[in-house]
């Protein structure tokens, strides 16, 4: 898998470790995130969007390119979601499973000045994304999975730790 360390002066010496693996049974990824020495009031805001078959080039400095969000339709159920995108007769889907915590909400991709602004932006938009805000305890691993569903790949959050362990062995 690919491993990344993220540090920020706001975290006062804390850091976030990310390990990302591709999935062997379908197109997709699983990500494990852990935190060390974050302030006790640290919260994680995650967001997802911009499903599009086209490569979108943008001059904006947005983490999620707004041009790729226009035709995204989200269906959430707890901490799982499905994104429908593409042309009406050729709809495609991406499935996602996120950690426990508050259910994801619709947000406005135009409002990416900072994570909290995106989270609080509201659902009236022509560029929908989903986001959630949750507390994060030191040593608590968080798992995220994005994938194309098929007969071998239909995941829920309880499966993610074992799925990550399997994929890290396949993608050292």
Where are these regions (language model features)?
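Acidic/polar, glycine-enriched structural segments that form the non-catalytic walls/loops
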Residues: 11, 15, 23-30, 34-172
